[in-house]
């Protein structure tokens, strides 16, 4: 399954401690493409593991994680405006 993950962590005192942990978890499973955005092909068991790890740190009242998924990345159109990073320019 192809996944795009986007997170938003409030950067209060606790958030500053959570942010690097969330980043590290996401990077373990997906490719970092822009600030708090990750993408990649991942199996369902790994998606479950990713979500379970993130739930340990995400504060439901202030932080958020959004997962967009598709069976295959070729069903998505990716269009760039501005700087194109090599990590995310593999396809359009």
Locations of the language-model features?
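Extended, hydrophobic alpha-helical segments
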Residues: 1-37, 41, 45-46
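Unusually extended, aromatic-enriched hydrophobic runs near protein termini
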Residues: 4, 26, 50, 83-92
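Glutamate identity and glutamate-enriched acidic tracts
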Residues: 13-14, 39, 53, 73, ...
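Short, intrinsically disordered low-complexity segments
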Residues: 34-64, 69-70
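C-terminal structural segments of small proteins and small subunits
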Residues: 57-92
């Amino acid at each position: 399954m192809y996944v795009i993950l986007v997170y938003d962590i409030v950067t209060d005192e606790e958030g500053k401690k959570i942010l690097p942990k969330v980043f590290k978890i996401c990077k373990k499973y997906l490719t970092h493409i822009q600030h708090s955005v990750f993408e990649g092909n991942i199996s369902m068991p790994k998606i479950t593991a990713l979500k379970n790890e993130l739930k340990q740190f995400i504060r439901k009242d202030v932080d958020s994680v959004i997962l967009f998924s598709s069976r295959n990345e070729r069903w998505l159109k990716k269009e760039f405006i501005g700087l194109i990073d090599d990590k995310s320019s593999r396809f359009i």
